[in-house]
Amino acid sequence: MNIRPLNDKLIVERQEVENKSEGGIVLTSQSVKKSNRGKVIAAGLGKRLENGERASMEVKVGDVVIFNDGYGVKTEKMDGKEYLILSESDVLAIVE
């Protein structure tokens, strides 16, 4: 199944968090919080402006981003993987 985001939406594959502490202790799944970092696998064309044009997207496919994992972030399962659907405004930073 393919998914194509609309407007300023992004499809992000969440990156896994290391399950070891700095001291080398393996942490249980309950004590490891979900990562708020992921790789953009698809991006919309940009938000439509009042004049009919589209605002350009700063975030591009392939970027690794840090995002606000809160209200408005949707989770979708496809082909056994979990993807996030979020707005470009939910992205806090691009990791370079």
From Swiss-Prot:
Alphabetically list the UniProt keywords: Chaperone, Cytoplasm
Which SUPFAM superfamilies has this protein been placed in? GroES-like
Q: Extract the signal peptide range.
A: none
Q: Which CDD domains match?
A: cpn10
**What PROSITE patterns is this protein classified in?**
CHAPERONINS_CPN10 (PS00681)
Q: Which Pfam families match?
A: Cpn10
A GO cellular-component term linked to this record: cytoplasm
GO MF annotations, alphabetized? ATP binding; metal ion binding; protein folding chaperone; protein-folding chaperone binding; unfolded protein binding
One GO term under biological process is: chaperone cofactor-dependent protein refolding
SMART domains this protein is in? Answer: Cpn10
Q: Where in the cell is it found?
A: Cytoplasm
Q: Which InterPro entries does the record cross-reference, listed alphabetically?
A: Chaperonin_GroES, Chaperonin_GroES_sf, Chaprnonin_Cpn10_CS, GroES-like_sf
Instruction: State the family named in the UniProt similarity comment for this chain.
Output: Belongs to the GroES chaperonin family.
Q: Spell out the PANTHER family in the cross-references.
A: 10 KDA HEAT SHOCK PROTEIN, CO-CHAPERONIN GROES
Which HAMAP family does this UniProt record tie to the protein? CH10 (MF_00580)
| The protein's role, per its UniProt record | Together with the chaperonin GroEL, plays an essential role in assisting protein folding. The GroEL-GroES system forms a nano-cage that allows encapsulation of the non-native substrate proteins and provides a physical environment optimized to promote and accelerate protein folding. GroES binds to the apical surface of the GroEL ring, thereby capping the opening of the GroEL channel.
Q: How does it assemble?
A: Heptamer of 7 subunits arranged in a ring. Interacts with the chaperonin GroEL.
- The identity of this protein, by name, is Co-chaperonin GroES 2
Q: What is the organism field in this record?
A: Vibrio vulnificus (strain YJ016)
